[in-house]
Regions:
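Acidic donor-binding segment of Leloir-type glycosyltransferases
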Residues: 283, 288-320
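GT-A fold catalytic core of metal-dependent nucleotide-sugar glycosyltransferases
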Residues: 207-210, 341-391, 755
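Peripheral, non-catalytic regulatory segments
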Residues: 74-252
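C-terminal catalytic/acceptor-binding lobe
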Residues: 454-647, 880-896
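Active-site-proximal specificity loops/subdomain of glycosyltransferases
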Residues: 310-351
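Contiguous segments within soluble domain cores/interaction surfaces
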Residues: 652-753, 757-762, 766-896
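N-terminal signal-anchor transmembrane helix specifying type II single-pass membrane topology
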Residues: 2-59
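Catalytic core and acceptor-binding pocket of nucleotide-sugar-dependent glycosyltransferases
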Residues: 377, 385, 389-394, 399-520
Length: 898
């Protein structure tokens, strides 16, 4: 009996041991088969010796650097998805091939024009043929006798002290000596090593001879090539990549020979900040330097205003060929190269070209920059991301094909970068020598021809092109890892994927410097940094004034309106002026309101054409808008400027316990997530605007959820949003899901805590007097003023007290709204004026009378005295030396502002 029990116990124990061992070895096999790929190495490298410089990348690149899969492009392909199918019935052409790329098919469906759709199809088909991109390019940076692929031996490695410690990757199915060599060449390392079959290492230093062991100790087959061996257990086959150890040049700090230098300032301008452009030119101008100015093709106002500079100054030229330079677009690199070719053809003699935008400003005197560059003639200044090239390629999207059309960068598929060259990149702000620029512009080498094809289809191409050419050309020994710039990166604010509307990618943008960032600029005093970005006077002008003082500008005490800033919103000479229906409707109503106020003073004026509209700020506080328009006064043709400002419409329930936590609760449009402001300062909204609710809570508020209700002018709930209040979400925005056109009239937005109304704000959707530049007709009114109530969600069950009107009141509001939206002509204008009076206040008027020879003489109209605009401090026509191009001092070669 006892013997039988022992046999049974032995039998079950034996089975248990076999089961445990089977499970153990199965787990090992699973771990080997699913060993992390290159995309997972980011996390593995935390325990290995490497040179992951994410902070360096964060300092210079416009790409998101957050760890983890925070972007759609970070996610692995979902192979289980159904195959994408091209909807050929939407095309008016026959595709030349079967488009296989899911990304290309998505881009074709989203593109608006048939031209763009066909361009994407044709380019995708060329790439699918396999001969579009060069497979290999030559690296012309040969400074030693190293040979690509030469095996230098088998070496014993150590876990805590790796032979090659600069990069580590694990490639379970692909690894081979050639595969690892290509990766190390791409990253710019002199040595490549394979180990344990699947592992690839790169390094800068040759392994010590004391670690060399017999070749037979490296005996594991390579998964990517069974005819090759890939090291062994802590044994490594080491190969030369053919490259030398790359060491950027260290620039000199002092100019020994004292020779002068000539700089081409390549200004690439966008937007409407004309006065800031003048301020930048005033600071940099010397008669021995050159200014070559490219203005975005869409910026008619800026180009028109700056055209006169060519006649005033022989060393200033405007680019005759203009590009639409969207964020991240391939057109940016085309523009830079075209500009460089153009000023080379002009025959200018120069020593450096430095590209700047209207958002750049010098943080050292021009003389300091001249001395520094003079001491380092021939060197090329670019800023690199760091050494983790594989991550940079992935995060920058260099392994993707992009195509620009319809001012959009479409992602259309994957690609493999050519073998044989080192990939580098970082910032697109550079300082380049004439020899290097000429080498690029001539473009005779196969390297340049190949890179041209690659970067024509690359996101943010200027952030990598110049760096990559430098690293792989005869100019590799002129590379300086410094672009002379300090950039105000605030990743939590600047990396909000705010460019998704122009590019199929998540991008980052630096923040504007404000006075609270002053320490960052002060810290550059003893560093080789000469420019900072970004600066926007519409955001913060005080910091620019402080920087001018910092670099030695000493005329501020002579400028009366030093703290004032004006920026154009509208100009009648703009090519798009006639189609700005909302702004023209709004401005027309404001000047009619002003004429009625003047009429009460016995001043009758006949209104004429609206000429210009400016935004006005003083001491970095928005003070309103200024409308410049023609008028007939006392029988004379004059120009009047009217100053007005939006009213505040915030009602708070002081019985609510959380009301004290609310700092901001208002609606606007053109919300800038990075700067946390509405770019539409005046809150001018029409039926086709995209309203956004901005809210801000104090840091002492309680956590929890709040409800936001949107009520249209007819008393109907249009949308409901839930917002969270916590310490990490103090300032945020809500965009309602309401289709165009929005119903014109007075809208309300309510904030609720459960059923308690906490705050209410109002905003105006102005009816349109014009449509496509012409007065609206009966038929057009029915289209643009009818609203989109049929698309609202069913929210009839939500009826909070003191917000949604009762049934009878709601029916009356609906009846009034239906009557209003049918108005045209004078009846429509009366409705518009009635609404605008509730939302805007007139603050003053001034006059510009060409017949009046005395600038300080007032003009009497009835009982109203008009001051001349030229002596009215708030007027856009008042003198602004800091925002006007100065006069040339022939003795110093500088521009004097006053």
């Amino acid at each position: 009996m006892v013997l039988n029990i022992r046999r049974i116990i032995y039998k079950y124990a034996k089975c248990l041991i076999i089961t445990v061992l089977t499970i153990f070895f199965a787990q090992i096999l699973i771990s080997i088969n699913y060993f992390p790929s290159i995309h997972e190495n980011i996390f593995l490298r935390k325990n290995s010796h490497n040179s992951l410089h994410l902070n360096n990348l964060a300092d210079v690149s416009a790409r998101r650097i957050n760890p983890g899969n925070s972007d759609d492009e970070d996610l692995a392909p979902r192979n289980h998805q159904n195959k994408a199918v091209l909807r050929k019935e939407e095309l008016d052409f026959i595709p030349v091939c079967e488009v296989k790329s899911r990304e290309a098919i998505s881009a074709i469906h989203r593109a608006k024009s048939q031209f763009c759709k066909q361009l994407i199809v044709n380019k995708t088909c060329l790439i699918q043929n396999g001969n579009f991109y060069p497979q290999e390019l030559n690296n012309d940076c040969k400074l030693n006798a190293k040979i690509f692929g030469r095996h230098i031996g088998c070496y014993l490695d150590e876990k805590k002290l790796r032979l090659l410690s600069s990069f580590y990757g694990n490639y379970a199915n692909l690894n081979s000596p050639l595969y690892c060599l290509d990766i190390c060449v791409q990253a710019g390392f002199p040595y490549a090593g394979v180990q344990y079959g699947t592992e690839c290492f790169c390094g800068e230093e040759s392994p010590p001879e004391t670690s060399k062991i017999p070749d037979k100790s490296c005996d594991m087959k390579c998964p990517g090539d069974n005819n090759q061996v890939c090291g062994g257990y802590f044994t490594m086959n080491v190969y030369e990549t053919g490259l030398h150890k790359f060491i950027p040049q260290t620039p000199e700090t002092k100019n020994q020979d004292g020779k002068s230098i000539r700089i081409v300032f390549l200004l690439t301008l966008n937007g409407r900040a004309l006065r800031q452009v003048y301020r930048l030119i005033n600071t940099l101008y010397r008669k021995n330097h050159y200014f070559y100015i490219h203005i975005d093709k869409r910026q008619d106002y800026l180009h028109r205003e700056l055209s006169s500079l060519e006649k005033q100054f022989p060393n200033i030229r405007l680019a005759p060929v203009r590009f639409s330079t969207i964020w991240g677009g391939a057109s940016l690199l085309k523009m830079l190269l075209n500009c460089m070719k153009d000023f080379i053809d002009l025959g200018w003699e120069w020593d450096y070209v430095i590209n700047l935008s209207e958002s750049d400003f010098p943080i050292k005197s021009l003389e300091e920059l001249e001395n520094f560059l003079s001491a380092n003639k021939g060197l090329n200044f670019v800023k690199s991301h760091g050494r983790e090239v594989q991550r940079f390629i992935k995060k920058q999207g260099l392994d993707k094909t992009f195509l620009e059309c319809e001012t959009h960068m479409w992602r259309i598929g994957e690609r493999k970068l050519p073998r044989g060259i080192t990939i580098d990149g970082g910032s697109d702000w550079v300082a380049l020598s004439p020899d290097f620029v000429s080498y690029i512009i001539e473009g005779k080498q196969d390297l340049l021809k190949g890179l041209e094809i690659i970067f024509e289809h690359t996101l943010l191409p200027a952030e990598s092109f110049f760096h990559t050419v430098l690293r792989n050309s005869k100019f590799c020994n002129t590379y300086v890892d410094n672009n002379l710039h300090v950039t105000n990166w605030k990743r939590k604010l600047g990396c909000k994927c705010q460019y998704k509307h122009v590019v199929d990618w998540c991008g980052c943008s630096p923040n504007d410097f404000r006075t609270e960032d002053w320490a960052k600029i002060q810290n550059t005093l003893n560093r080789q940094l000469f420019f900072a970005r970004k600066f926007e006077p519409i955001i913060n002008q005080e910091i620019i004034t402080r920087v001018e003082q910092f670099i030695g500008v000493n005329d501020h005490y002579l400028i009366n309106n030093l703290e004032a800033y004006w920026q154009s919103i509208y100009d009648t000479n703009d090519l798009t002026a006639s189609s700005d229906d909302t702004i023209l409707t709004h401005a027309g109503s404001i000047i009619r309101q002003n004429s009625k106020i003047l009429a009460t003073e016995g001043c009758d004026i006949k209104l004429g054409e609206i000429l210009e509209i400016h935004l006005y700020k003083y001491a970095d506080v928005y003070k309103g808008n200024l409308i410049l328009h023609k008028a007939v006064l006392n029988g004379l043709n004059v120009v009047i400027e009217t100053w007005y400002k939006p009213k505040q419409h915030l009602e708070l329930n002081f019985n609510s316990p959380i009301v004290d936590y609310i700092k901001t609760f208002r609606v606007g449009s053109d919300y800038d997530q990075k700067e946390m402001i509405f770019r539409n300062f005046g809150g001018i909204l029409g039926p086709f605007s995209d309203p956004v609710l901005l809210y801000q809570f104090s840091s002492h508020k309680q956590s929890g959820n709040l409800t936001v209700l949107w009520l249209d002018p007819a008393g109907m709930l249009a949308d409901v949003n839930i917002i969270s209040r916590d310490e990490n979400n103090l300032t945020n925005f809500v965009k309602p899901n309401i289709r165009h056109p929005l119903l014109p009239g007075l809208w309300k937005v309510g904030l609720f805590e459960q059923t308690t109304l906490v705050a209410v704000t109002k905003f105006l959707i102005t009816p349109l007097e014009y449509f496509s530049g012409k007065e609206v007709s009966h038929q057009e009114v029915g289209l643009i003023h009818s609203g989109s109530q049929n698309s609202y969600r069913n929210l009839t069950n939500i009826k909070p007290l003191k917000f949604v009107p009762a049934k009878e009141e709601s029916l009356l509001m609906e009846e009034v709204s239906n009557s209003n939206i049918k108005r045209i002509g004078n009846d429509l204008r009366e409705w518009i004026d009635m609404l605008n009076i509730e939302f805007y206040s007139i603050l003053g008027s001034c006059i510009n009378d060409s017949k009046n020879t005395q600038e300080s003489e007032k003009v009497l109209c009835g009982n109203y005295h008009f001051n001349p605009c030229t002596v009215t401090e708030w007027s856009s026509l008042s003198p602004d030396p800091k925002g006007s191009v100065g006069k040339l001092d022939i003795h110093t070669g500088r521009l004097k502002r006053v």
